[in-house]
């Protein structure tokens, strides 16, 4: 433990929970504030998707560890404001407020928002994981290339929707090649009857159709639909963090640092967000040498 005593962690997703767990283990007094009536952030919703129930252990383990500790106070349904933060006497403020999925089509292929007709029903993974029910045919545009597009396709098929899966990659869930899951994912979608369209991106969204752009020929084709689900990229929820100026922090003598971690800093996989929480807690009150590695490499010799 360092010289500080109290830390406020805002957000209880993977990053916030891991930061809370590690900080409390080090001996700090930690207050964890969560705006929802439950902890877990994105994992609480994603664990309910087809095939992802085991991911809930990310939350279950940390919740179990935190509940054993007396130096952690958890406040649910507590949406913290800037005024609240300045009125309390926390020495360190850690924002782990997560991210939301974009609904403008911006991702790896489309670097600018698409032209979208206002009468088209536009959805994001946050909508599908919430209480929104989609009727009829759904076009999923997957420019995320990991697991989310495919599990949402499976969820929608099981709910009775006709699903067309569009991706600019040559295969479904291309990034999943790195985890050896890709062949199983594509096989699963084919068996479910999902129509797969590869090597095409969405260039425009009309009131009753989407225009597809072939990445090789540049030819335009159209798909009739009233529902488009964008699985493209995520936007950090960092408005409260950015509302603090350096002058305000300097004027408030009790605040030693304000940091932002996890998806709120840069949206990434759950494992990275969890590590971000650990890294923040591990280095608090320490002088970090930015020019050196935070670990020692094992150099092996080859013996003939």
What are these regions (language model features)?
Residues 210-214:
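SH3/SH3-like beta-barrel fold
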Residues 41-91, 175-201, 209:
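N-terminal Rossmann-like dinucleotide/flavin-binding domain of flavoprotein oxidoreductases
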Residues 1-35, 39, 74-86, 96-113, ...:
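Rossmann-like dinucleotide/flavin-binding elements
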